[in-house]
């Protein structure tokens, strides 16, 4: 049985850990509120932007812009993987990495060459351990703002237009609510406009586009790609903080449980020590008779 001193040291250590996890939970909770506001305000804009692109695309064919053309004979594809730079957020990064590698394997089995653009240290470190090349790494010191999204957008669009590329896939953490985050993934290029329902088609039918649909698409499609990447940044940021808040809350609860178990062990050990001393005293008294 452990000594009283050892048990007390363990209890003190767990209490210090609890203080850390509780503080991290509070920090993650505060960051989540800000991140949640950002993504909830940005989503309506991104969705309306997609409606505009879909409306323009229905009034033209794929050949009007190369970013709309479906390709089947491409030899390569790029995966944009957005993860966190830091850990202690449960299985959040793991599920993103697993999904990315799963999708990459599907492409390689079809004879496609897969390469990665990594945003986030956790994703970068995981991909480094595989045979997939990393084209660009935006981890640690990079601020995930609209400017970075625009830079990445220009890079992948240039690659898509100049290289025999099949598609560009975006993988990110999709924020549902504080308790639920899932893996979000979508084909970034070629752009697949979502089908419009009858009501939407009638709504946009009387629109007159100047200077023309083709010119508008050439201006808006690159911005649409940037918007989708930036939305991935915001979604992942909110998901990361929500996952960390939940993980630290669970860790704090586990600390409470462990402190309870160790306290019971301490009391049991102390009682055993007292009983042993009483037995020694009684035995000594009996021996003196």
From Swiss-Prot:
Similarity remark: Belongs to the ATPase gamma chain family.
CDD domains found in the cross-reference section: F1-ATPase_gamma (cd12151)
Protein name, as recorded: ATP synthase gamma chain
Molecular functions per Gene Ontology: ATP binding; proton-transporting ATP synthase activity, rotational mechanism
Function: Produces ATP from ADP in the presence of a proton gradient across the membrane. The gamma chain is believed to be important in regulating ATPase activity and the flow of protons through the CF(0) complex.
Organism: Lawsonia intracellularis (strain PHE/MN1-00)
UniProt GO cellular component terms: plasma membrane; proton-transporting ATP synthase complex
Subcellular location field: Cell membrane
Gene: atpG
Pfam families hit by this protein: ATP-synt
Keywords from the named record: ATP synthesis, Cell membrane, CF(1), Hydrogen ion transport, Ion transport, Membrane, Transport
């Amino acid at each position: 049985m452990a000594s009283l001193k050892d048990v007390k040291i363990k209890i003190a250590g767990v209490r210090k850990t609890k203080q850390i996890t509780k503080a991290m939970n509070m920090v993650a909770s505060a960051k989540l509120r800000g991140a949640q506001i950002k993504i909830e305000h940005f989503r309506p804009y991104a969705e309306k932007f997609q409606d505009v692109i879909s409306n323009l695309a229905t009034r033209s064919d794929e050949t009007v812009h190369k970013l709309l053309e479906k390709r089947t004979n491409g030899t390569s594809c790029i995966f944009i993987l957005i993860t966190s730079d830091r850990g202690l957020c449960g299985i959040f990064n793991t599920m993103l990495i697993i999904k990315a590698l799963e999708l990459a394997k599907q492409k390689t089995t079809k004879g496609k060459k897969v390469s990665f653009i990594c945003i986030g240290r956790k994703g970068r470190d995981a991909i480094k351990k595989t045979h997939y090349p990393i084209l660009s790494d935006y981890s640690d010191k990079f601020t995930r703002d609209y400017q970075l999204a625009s830079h990445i957008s220009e890079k992948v669009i240039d690659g898509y237009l100049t290289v025999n590329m099949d598609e560009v896939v975006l993988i990110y953490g999709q924020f549902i609510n504080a308790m639920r985050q899932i893996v979000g993934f979508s084909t970034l290029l070629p752009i697949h406009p979502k089908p419009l329902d009858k009501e939407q088609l009638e709504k946009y039918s009387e629109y007159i586009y100047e200077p023309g649909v083709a010119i508008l698409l050439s201006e808006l499609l690159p911005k649409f790609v940037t918007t989708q990447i930036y939305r991935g940044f915001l979604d992942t940021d909110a998901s990361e903080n929500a996952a960390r808040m939940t993980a630290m809350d669970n860790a704090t609860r586990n600390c409470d449980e462990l402190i309870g178990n160790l306290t019971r062990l301490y009391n049991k050990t102390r009682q055993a020590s007292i009983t042993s001393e009483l037995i020694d005293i009684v035995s000594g008294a009996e021996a003196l008779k």
